C-alpha cells in the first residue's frame, strides 16, 4: 500500500510540473499577444485589449499594466496577482523569478507572486 501511495504521489508531482508551461517568447501584434513555450510551440493568444500593456515576462509568468493596475499572469493569461500602480511605481525589469520597480527614489524587488522581497534607495 505504501508503494502504491508513493508511486501515485510521484505521478501527481510529475503531472503538476508538466502542466506548468514555460514562456520562451511573447510575440506582440497590433491586437494580440501570442505566447510561445521553450519548444517554439504556441501556448495561446491573448487580446491586447483584455491584457493591457505588456511590461515583461519571466519563465512562467508575465506582467501587464491595465488601467491603474499591474497584473501578474501565468502562461495562459490567468491573473495570479493584481497590484496597484500607485503602490508599485513603474516596472523597470522582469526576470525569470522577480519583478523590479521604481517609485520615487526607491527601487523595489517583488517575487513572481507579488510579494515585496527587497527595497533600497536609488543611486540617482
Provide a role label for each language-model segment.
Residues 3-16:
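Sec-dependent N-terminal signal peptides
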Residues 46-63, 81-101, 117-124:
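Residue-level detector of conserved, function-critical positions
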Residues 32-48, 71-84, 109-122:
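Surface-exposed loop/turn elements that mediate protein-protein interactions on large endomembrane-trafficking
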Residues 20-28, 33-34, 57-66, 70-71, ...:
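Short beta-strand elements that form the blades of beta-propeller/WD-repeat-like
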Residues 16-18, 36-37:
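Short, low-complexity, intrinsically disordered N-terminal segments
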Residues 20-25, 42-53:
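Beta-strand-rich domains and repeat architectures in extracellular enzymes and scaffolds
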